[in-house]
Amino acid sequence: DGSPVMINLVHDIDILRFAIGEIVQAKALRGRSQRGAVRIETGAIAFGFETGAVGTVAFSDVTPSPWGFEAGTGENPNIGATHQDMMWITGTKGALSFPSMTLWQGEDWGQAARKIPTTAEKNVKVPLDAQLDHFLEVIDGAEPMIDVADATKTLEVALSLEAELAGQSEMGNVQV
Protein backbone atom coordinates (compact mmCIF):
# COMPACT_ATOMS: atom_id res chain seq x y z
CA ASP A 1 0.00 0.00 0.00
CA GLY A 2 3.07 2.25 0.15
CA SER A 3 3.88 4.82 -2.49
CA PRO A 4 6.98 4.84 -4.67
CA VAL A 5 8.26 7.81 -2.63
CA MET A 6 8.95 5.72 0.47
CA ILE A 7 9.67 2.47 -1.37
CA ASN A 8 11.85 3.69 -4.25
CA LEU A 9 12.48 7.45 -4.37
CA VAL A 10 13.99 7.39 -0.88
CA HIS A 11 16.99 5.53 -2.34
CA ASP A 12 17.42 8.09 -5.13
CA ILE A 13 17.36 10.80 -2.45
CA ASP A 14 20.19 8.95 -0.65
CA ILE A 15 22.28 8.81 -3.83
CA LEU A 16 21.65 12.48 -4.66
CA ARG A 17 22.61 13.60 -1.14
CA PHE A 18 25.79 11.50 -1.31
CA ALA A 19 26.79 12.64 -4.81
CA ILE A 20 25.66 16.28 -4.84
CA GLY A 21 25.10 17.45 -1.26
CA GLU A 22 22.34 18.24 1.17
CA ILE A 23 18.90 18.95 -0.21
CA VAL A 24 17.71 22.36 0.98
CA GLN A 25 14.63 22.75 -1.20
CA ALA A 26 12.21 20.41 -2.92
CA LYS A 27 8.98 20.89 -4.84
CA ALA A 28 6.73 17.98 -5.72
CA LEU A 29 4.11 17.52 -8.44
CA ARG A 30 1.68 14.61 -8.26
CA GLY A 31 0.63 12.75 -11.39
CA ARG A 32 -2.67 11.13 -12.26
CA SER A 33 -3.54 7.70 -10.85
CA GLN A 34 -3.48 4.91 -13.43
CA ARG A 35 -4.84 2.17 -11.19
CA GLY A 36 -7.52 4.18 -9.42
CA ALA A 37 -5.53 3.96 -6.19
CA VAL A 38 -5.73 6.59 -3.47
CA ARG A 39 -1.99 6.37 -2.90
CA ILE A 40 0.57 8.30 -4.91
CA GLU A 41 1.60 6.38 -8.04
CA THR A 42 3.60 8.85 -10.06
CA GLY A 43 5.07 12.33 -9.88
CA ALA A 44 8.04 14.61 -10.33
CA ILE A 45 10.33 16.42 -7.91
CA ALA A 46 12.54 19.48 -8.36
CA PHE A 47 15.43 19.61 -5.89
CA GLY A 48 17.70 22.43 -4.77
CA PHE A 49 21.02 21.51 -3.13
CA GLU A 50 23.19 23.48 -0.72
CA THR A 51 25.94 23.32 -3.35
CA GLY A 52 23.80 25.47 -5.66
CA ALA A 53 23.00 22.55 -7.92
CA VAL A 54 19.44 21.78 -8.97
CA GLY A 55 17.97 18.50 -10.11
CA THR A 56 14.80 16.78 -11.22
CA VAL A 57 13.47 13.29 -10.66
CA ALA A 58 10.42 11.69 -12.25
CA PHE A 59 9.09 8.60 -10.49
CA SER A 60 6.36 6.05 -11.07
CA ASP A 61 5.45 2.54 -10.13
CA VAL A 62 2.98 2.18 -13.02
CA THR A 63 5.44 2.53 -15.89
CA PRO A 64 7.59 -0.58 -16.33
CA SER A 65 10.77 0.43 -18.12
CA PRO A 66 14.42 -0.55 -18.50
CA TRP A 67 15.52 2.57 -16.58
CA GLY A 68 14.47 1.72 -13.01
CA PHE A 69 17.01 1.46 -10.19
CA GLU A 70 16.76 -2.32 -9.73
CA ALA A 71 16.65 -2.97 -13.48
CA GLY A 72 19.69 -0.77 -14.01
CA THR A 73 21.79 -2.05 -11.13
CA GLY A 74 20.67 -5.67 -11.25
CA GLU A 75 20.70 -5.60 -7.45
CA ASN A 76 17.41 -7.41 -6.94
CA PRO A 77 17.30 -10.94 -8.40
CA ASN A 78 13.48 -10.71 -8.47
CA ILE A 79 13.52 -7.85 -10.99
CA GLY A 80 14.81 -8.35 -14.53
CA ALA A 81 18.17 -6.63 -15.04
CA THR A 82 18.65 -4.37 -18.07
CA HIS A 83 21.86 -2.66 -16.87
CA GLN A 84 20.62 0.61 -18.37
CA ASP A 85 21.52 3.90 -16.74
CA MET A 86 18.74 5.51 -14.74
CA MET A 87 20.44 8.62 -13.38
CA TRP A 88 22.50 11.31 -15.09
CA ILE A 89 24.40 13.89 -13.07
CA THR A 90 25.72 16.80 -15.11
CA GLY A 91 27.96 19.69 -14.18
CA THR A 92 29.99 22.47 -15.74
CA LYS A 93 32.90 20.17 -16.60
CA GLY A 94 31.21 16.91 -17.43
CA ALA A 95 28.59 14.31 -16.64
CA LEU A 96 28.27 10.96 -14.91
CA SER A 97 25.80 8.17 -15.72
CA PHE A 98 24.64 5.77 -13.01
CA PRO A 99 24.91 2.82 -12.50
CA SER A 100 27.42 2.36 -15.35
CA MET A 101 29.60 5.13 -13.86
CA THR A 102 30.25 6.39 -17.39
CA LEU A 103 32.11 9.69 -17.12
CA TRP A 104 31.90 12.36 -19.82
CA GLN A 105 34.17 15.40 -19.84
CA GLY A 106 33.63 18.59 -21.76
CA GLU A 107 33.72 22.31 -21.07
CA ASP A 108 33.15 23.70 -24.55
CA TRP A 109 29.78 23.48 -26.30
CA GLY A 110 31.63 23.57 -29.62
CA GLN A 111 33.38 20.28 -28.86
CA ALA A 112 31.78 16.88 -28.34
CA ALA A 113 32.04 15.62 -24.78
CA ARG A 114 34.75 12.98 -24.35
CA LYS A 115 34.09 9.66 -22.67
CA ILE A 116 36.65 9.18 -19.90
CA PRO A 117 37.63 5.59 -19.10
CA THR A 118 36.78 4.59 -15.54
CA THR A 119 37.01 1.40 -13.61
CA ALA A 120 34.17 0.81 -11.21
CA GLU A 121 34.65 -1.78 -8.51
CA LYS A 122 32.43 -4.77 -9.21
CA ASN A 123 30.56 -6.28 -6.30
CA VAL A 124 30.36 -10.03 -6.67
CA LYS A 125 27.84 -10.40 -3.85
CA VAL A 126 24.10 -10.05 -4.37
CA PRO A 127 23.46 -6.57 -2.91
CA LEU A 128 20.47 -7.70 -0.85
CA ASP A 129 22.65 -10.43 0.70
CA ALA A 130 25.43 -7.89 1.34
CA GLN A 131 22.94 -5.60 3.11
CA LEU A 132 21.78 -8.42 5.36
CA ASP A 133 25.38 -9.47 6.08
CA HIS A 134 26.25 -5.88 7.03
CA PHE A 135 23.17 -5.66 9.26
CA LEU A 136 24.29 -8.81 11.09
CA GLU A 137 27.81 -7.36 11.45
CA VAL A 138 26.34 -4.19 13.00
CA ILE A 139 24.35 -6.32 15.45
CA ASP A 140 27.68 -7.91 16.39
CA GLY A 141 29.20 -4.46 17.07
CA ALA A 142 30.59 -3.27 13.72
CA GLU A 143 30.20 0.39 12.73
CA PRO A 144 27.30 0.94 10.33
CA MET A 145 28.15 2.28 6.87
CA ILE A 146 25.41 4.90 7.29
CA ASP A 147 24.69 6.42 10.67
CA VAL A 148 21.26 7.26 12.07
CA ALA A 149 21.71 11.02 11.58
CA ASP A 150 22.42 10.58 7.86
CA ALA A 151 19.54 8.17 7.36
CA THR A 152 17.24 10.56 9.24
CA LYS A 153 18.05 13.40 6.81
CA THR A 154 17.01 11.25 3.85
CA LEU A 155 13.88 10.12 5.65
CA GLU A 156 12.96 13.73 6.49
CA VAL A 157 13.17 14.72 2.81
CA ALA A 158 11.13 11.69 1.71
CA LEU A 159 8.44 12.24 4.37
CA SER A 160 8.20 15.92 3.46
CA LEU A 161 7.71 15.04 -0.22
CA GLU A 162 5.19 12.32 0.63
CA ALA A 163 3.16 14.83 2.69
CA GLU A 164 3.30 17.46 -0.05
CA LEU A 165 2.19 14.96 -2.70
CA ALA A 166 -0.57 13.52 -0.48
CA GLY A 167 -1.96 17.04 -0.03
CA GLN A 168 -2.32 17.56 -3.77
CA SER A 169 -5.23 16.47 -5.88
CA GLU A 170 -4.39 14.40 -8.91
CA MET A 171 -3.11 16.37 -11.83
CA GLY A 172 -5.97 16.83 -14.24
CA ASN A 173 -6.18 18.36 -17.67
CA VAL A 174 -4.93 21.87 -17.07
CA GLN A 175 -5.08 24.65 -19.62
CA VAL A 176 -1.81 26.58 -19.63
Residue ranges and their predicted role:
Residues 12-13, 129-133, 158:
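A general structural signal for well-ordered alpha-helical segments in protein cores
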